[in-house]
Amino acid sequence: MTNILINNAFGSDNPEKASVAFIVGGASAARDGETALFLTSEAINLARKNGTNGLQADGYKPMDELVQTYMDNGGILWVCKACADAKGMTADDLIDGAEIAGAGHTLSFVDDGAQVLM
């Protein structure tokens, strides 16, 4: 099965787009192959402890449930290092299972054959 990389730049600024990224990610993570969600810009706050509290797009499940389902299905959660540095975020700020990853780390995943969804 093909590995999948999903790039998500949306968080509380557009909860609907953020929700869709985690819904697609959760479905992909439940399949064979690896799925990584690369969070950039506002989306990095979704990996922050308590960063999804109270966040829910109209008609969608709460963001904390979508993130938890993604993680429970074996999804990989990467936070853009440049974005984290710009916002003063460290590994201690992240939910369990999330990690800060630089561009090289993410591009290696693509070089190894991952398909990219934006």
Predicted regions and their residues:
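Short, glycine-rich nucleotide/cofactor-binding loops
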Residues: 5-19, 50-51
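Histidine-anchored nucleotide/phosphate-binding helix
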Residues: 18-32, 37
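Anion (oxyanion) recognition and catalysis
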Residues: 29-30, 71, 110
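Short internal beta-strands
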Residues: 35-40, 77-81
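N-terminal beta-loop-helix "entrance" segment that forms/cooperates
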Residues: 43-57
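A glycine-rich helix N-cap at a beta->alpha junction
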Residues: 53-81
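C-terminal structural segments of small proteins and small subunits
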Residues: 86-111, 116-118
